[in-house]
Amino acid sequence: MTKNYFAMQWHITDRCDQRCKHCYIFAGEDKSYSPEFDLSTLKEIFFDFLATCKKMDKRPSISVTGGDPLLHKDVWSLLALFKEYNVPFAILGNPFHLNENVAKQLKELGCTTYQMSLDGLKETHDFIRKPGSFDATLNKIHVLNEVGIKSAIATTVSKTNIDEIPQLVKVAVDYQAKSFGFSRYCPNEKDRNNLVSPSEYKAFLEKMWEQFVILQDKGTAFILKDHLWKLFLYEKGLFKIEDDSELIMDGCHCGISHITVLA
């Protein structure tokens, strides 16, 4: 019988080349980096995770993120450990330290997916993240595809960029990203006015669904990450609820099928 996966999203560093306007890491008064664990402690966490997966009778899967995980001094030793124990992993990072040689190294160590962010069209994205970030991200999609790592594009939806995302998904498809998905922005205390209203968000889902239908045969998988997709599709008659009063349709999977570790 095939086991289900238990996933860990592992923040191994705060170090980053960007200062995204919606980033929670630098949202407070303290702009310094949090201390990083050394390789010995990272190994301890890794083996504890493997033991947990064994207890739960599930297969381990890890998404390594930050900051930019490629900036951690021990990242390559950590990824080599994943390979030694045959644990598949994804990188959630930036384009700036990614090149053909790095991509090949990641592939050899077992990297399945490399996720980068696009938070609007060029002007908006570079305003949110960093000048030059938009072009750098698009250019690295090809680098990943060439070595056989799935290129994933993720978007954070806010009032700043919501009108551009239906166009942005077309850009991601044109550049042959292997997947595209988005999440709602969770504002910090100083940025509540950037939160999208429920009616705006429902209209946005409608526009995105129309785009997904038009582009469904272009080779990009559209990840319906937001829990509200099920309600949206149910209202359109495209999602059926089983007749079972004990069935839980959706909700937070934390501790059930995934955990997040800040280290």
PLM regions and their residue ranges:
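Conserved alpha-helical substructure of the radical SAM core
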Residues: M1-T112
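Hydrophobic faces of well-ordered beta-strands that scaffold small-molecule active sites
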Residues: F6-M8, P60-V64, F89-I91, Y114-M116, ...
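Glycine-centered loop/turn positions within well-structured domains
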Residues: Q18, E123, S151
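Conserved residues at the C-terminal ends of beta-strands
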Residues: F26, T65, S117, S183, ...
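Conserved radical SAM core fold
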Residues: D30, P69-L71, P95-E100, Y114-P131, ...
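Radical SAM enzyme [4Fe-4S]-AdoMet core and its adjacent flexible, acidic
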Residues: S32, I128-A263
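A short alpha-helix capping/helix-coil boundary motif
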Residues: K55-R59, A80-E84, L118-L121, E146-K150, ...
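Glycine-enriched alpha-helix->loop->beta-strand junction motifs that scaffold or abut catalytic
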Residues: L109-T113, Y175-K178
